[in-house]
């Protein structure tokens, strides 16, 4: 199965590639400014992963265009910047996080849906980000699948989202980090998804 990894010039990209390869995926990595949508389509990928990166979704090359073009055609997973790109592609706002996270772990609560199916709840994850998708601006077509919580249990920041009808999901944290629990299992759940629609 050919998996296209859109690399947003991030040092973590090849850690993600390694995890996916260990799970049996054939991964082709392209930089976010290396190919047009037509060139990507010509390679006939079965699924796409949009990588983390040091920039904002607006600066992530072909990432948003690829999400919108392939939406409904094949499964798409966004990691960190890729997650934010999904949020922005469908109309959400990406804003400064309340607190910058650089290699910090957090317990994340989830709805046992999609890539989170069967994972620990809460799940300990590793976060490297200064931006988040603003919950109040999430469009109707997207739903929150995972979040950090305030002390009273209310939702703090979005840590996972997915499209309500299409096979498109994002995670704000880094499943490929050694300190994230069940990272392989999360990616394995993505690799089980087929087709563009749920």
Curated annotation (Swiss-Prot):
Catalytic residues, chain numbering: 80, 174, 176
An example Gene Ontology CC term for this record: cytosol
Assembly notes: Heterotetramer consisting of two non-identical subunits: a beta subunit (TrpG) and a large alpha subunit (TrpE).
Superkingdom classification of source: Bacteria
E.C. number(s) listed in UniProt: 4.1.3.27
Protein name: Anthranilate synthase component 2
Job description of the protein: Part of a heterotetrameric complex that catalyzes the two-step biosynthesis of anthranilate, an intermediate in the biosynthesis of L-tryptophan. In the first step, the glutamine-binding beta subunit (TrpG) of anthranilate synthase (AS) provides the glutamine amidotransferase activity which generates ammonia as a substrate that, along with chorismate, is used in the second step, catalyzed by the large alpha subunit of AS (TrpE) to produce anthranilate. In the absence of TrpG, TrpE can synthesize anthranilate directly from chorismate and high concentrations of ammonia.
Top EC class for this record: lyase
The Glutamine amidotransferase type-1 domain, residue ranges: 2-198
Example of a GO MF term: 4-amino-4-deoxychorismate synthase activity
């Amino acid at each position: 199965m050919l998996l296209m990894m859109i690399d947003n010039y991030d040092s973590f990209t090849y850690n993600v590639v390694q995890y996916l390869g260990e799970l049996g995926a054939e991964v082709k990595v392209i930089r976010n400014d290396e190919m047009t949508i037509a060139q990507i389509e010509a390679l006939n990928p079965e699924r796409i992963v949009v990588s983390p990166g040091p920039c904002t979704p607006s600066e992530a090359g072909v990432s948003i265009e690829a999400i919108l073009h392939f939406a409904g055609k094949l499964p798409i997973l966004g990691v960190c910047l890729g997650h934010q790109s999904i949020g922005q592609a469908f109309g959400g706002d990406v804003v400064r996080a309340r607190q910058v996270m650089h290699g910090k772990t957090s317990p994340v609560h989830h709805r046992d849906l999609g890539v989170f199916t069967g994972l620990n709840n809460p799940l300990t994850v590793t976060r490297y980000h200064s931006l988040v998708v603003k919950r109040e601006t999430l469009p109707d077509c997207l739903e929150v699948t995972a979040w950090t919580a305030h002390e009273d249990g209310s939702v703090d920041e979005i840590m996972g989202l997915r499209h309500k009808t299409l096979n498109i999901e994002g995670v704000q944290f880094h499943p490929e980090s050694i300190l994230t629990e069940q990272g392989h299992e999360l990616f394995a759940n993505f690799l089980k998804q087929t087709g563009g629609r749920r």
